[in-house]
Each structure stands twice: as structure tokens, then as C-alpha cells.
Regions:
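Long, well-ordered alpha-helical scaffolding segments within enzyme catalytic domains
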Residues: 265-281
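Active-site microenvironments that recognize anionic phosphate/pyrophosphate groups
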Residues: 2-263, 283
Length: 284
């Protein structure tokens, strides 16, 4: 009986520690959002509450709030360095409390994208900021904002990109850039089996379609709650621009049609390319 009581008391203390830790993680993640500019100060409480809902936590205790609030402010660089650790602890909590089906890379990517989606401004807000910067400052300022947002949102995973191997070599045709991309994770056997058995869906039709923006994902399709796209008019037709999450080269842009159409190179392709670089001359 005594041992049973001791075991219960230990379990209670362990649960309380985990409960306090997830509250700290939530506040630290919001602090990250504020430090990087992802979260507007006016949206701080709203963002905290969205994360509480996601983790099925009812409150932020006063002691936890004071502990995190009293921490020194973070620079952009400091915030970037803390994100991976914060998300790792959040996913540990999610798995241990039944919020994440498997503790594997595929399920972690699905869940941490869902977490980051709570911090990213709505598409209309991102597009308005982009247009304002383009019209009143410069095209460069607009793309700088959009690229930074794509990184800060963890859509472009900075910590994984750092693992890529890059070097140059001189050839008879000039200097050649060589990249070995290590940032795209390999699926584990369980995820491969789950993807094989998953219900097939034609939505979104491909990983570049506009319907990916905000999509929750599944084992055979990446989550995109933290993904934003910018509408463009190219050669009098509707297009979008986004950045590649794998960054095969600096500020790797993807410009795609608003309709799901086959990719092909034809005479009109070069006109579209010239129209794009006319609008964004710094990408020429």
C-alpha cells in the first residue's frame, strides 16, 4: 500500500513537471514568434490560446508565465537557435500524451508543421504586406520579407538546410556549383507502410498546387499549415510564387500556374520568365 502511494505521488509529480514544461514551451514558442516578427504583439494572447487548444492544455499557470516573461529578450539569431529544441520538447509531449500517432520523422514533420501554423499570419495578411512592400519600398524588400517569413515559419527548415553539402569546382565550362541535399528526410518503414495503405486522394493534385496552402497533410503528402504563396500576373494569366522548402540554391523560387497543368518548355515559357524577372529584376 505504501509503495503504491509512493508510486502515485511520483507519477503526479512527473505529470505536473510535464504539464509545466509544455506551458513553458508554448510561451517560448510565442516568444520566438514575437522575436522573429511572425507574431504581432497584438496577437500574443490569441496565439497562446491557439497553442493551448492544440495541446489540450487548459491554462498557463501564473508561476510559469512569470518565469518565461522574465527571461531576457531574444535576438533573431538567438531565436533561430532555440526553435529546434522547443519543437522537439513539444513533440515529445505530444507523443507521450497521445496527440501524435508515431514518434517518427514523418509524423513529427506533420505535427510540428501544425504547431508552426499557429504562428504564421493568414494568407491575406502576408499578401497585403508583400504588396505594400513591393509598391511602396521595392520588389527586393517584398521578396526579402517573404523569404524570411518562409524561413521563420519553419517551412524552410534552417537547421536541416545547414546539413547540406555544398562546394564549387572549376571546369572547362566555368565554375560549377555542386550540392548534396541532405535536408529532405528519408521515410521510416512504418511511414512507408502507412502511406501504401492510406486512402488515395487527389487533393491537392500535386505538391505545387495552390491548394497546398494551409493543408494539414497526411502520411503520403506533406503538411503545409505554415506555407504561404503570393499571387502574380504573368503574361496576363494567374500564377503564384513560393520558395522551395529544400533550397537547392539561394532563394530557390518556384513559380507555378494557378491551374494544375502539365509542366513543359515551349516558346511562351521564355516570355513568362522574362515577365517574371521584369517584375523582380533582382532575380535576373
Amino acid at each position: 500500500m505504501c509503495a503504491e502511494l509512493i508510486g502515485t505521488a511520483f507519477a503526479d509529480r512527473l505529470y505536473k513537471k510535464e504539464y509545466e514544461m509544455i506551458q513553458e514551451n508554448i510561451l517560448e514558442l510565442v516568444k520566438y514568434g514575437l522575436s522573429t516578427g511572425l507574431v504581432d504583439p497584438e496577437d500574443k494572447v490569441y496565439t497562446i490560446n491557439r497553442l493551448l487548444e492544440l495541446f489540450q492544455v487548459d491554462e498557463i499557470e501564473d508561476a510559469v508565465f512569470e518565469k518565461v516573461e522574465n527571461l531576457p529578450a531574444w535576438t533573431q539569431e538567438e531565436a533561430e537557435g532555440k526553435l529546434e529544441g522547443i519543437l522537439a520538447e513539444m513533440m515529445d509531449y505530444a507523443y507521450e500524451n497521445g496527440l501524435m500517432a508515431e514518434n517518427s520523422i514523418v509524423y513529427k514533420d506533420l505535427f510540428d508543421t501544425k504547431i508552426m501554423g499557429c504562428l504564421v499570419p493568414e494568407p491575406s495578411s502576408v499578401r497585403k504586406t508583400f504588396r505594400d512592400l513591393y509598391e511602396h519600398t521595392s520588389p527586393l524588400a517584398a521578396t526579402d520579407y517573404f523569404y524570411k517569413l518562409s524561413c521563420d515559419s519553419n517551412y524552410i527548415r534552417r537547421q536541416r538546410i545547414k546539413k547540406d553539402r555544398k562546394w564549387t569546382t572549376d571546369t572547362e565550362f566555368g565554375t560549377l556549383d555542386i550540392t548534396i541535399n541532405l535536408s529532405k528526410p528519408e521515410k521510416d518503414p512504418k511511414a512507408i507502410a502507412a502511406a501504401k495503405n492510406a486512402k488515395q486522394s487527389a487533393y491537392p493534385k500535386c505538391q505545387l498546387c495552390k491548394e497546398n496552402e494551409g493543408y494539414a497533410g497526411r502520411v503520403n503528402h506533406p503538411a503545409r499549415q505554415n506555407h504561404r504563396i503570393i499571387p502574380l500576373t504573368i503574361n496576363n494569366s494567374d500564377w503564384f510564387v513560393q520558395y522551395s522548402p529544400y533550397v537547392y540554391y539561394n532563394e530557390h523560387c518556384i513559380v507555378f500556374n494557378s491551374k494544375h497543368t502539365p509542366m513543359k518548355i515551349e516558346r511562351a515559357t521564355f516570355g513568362k520568365l522574362l515577365d517574371f524577372v521584369t517584375q523582380f529584376p533582382h532575380y535576373f
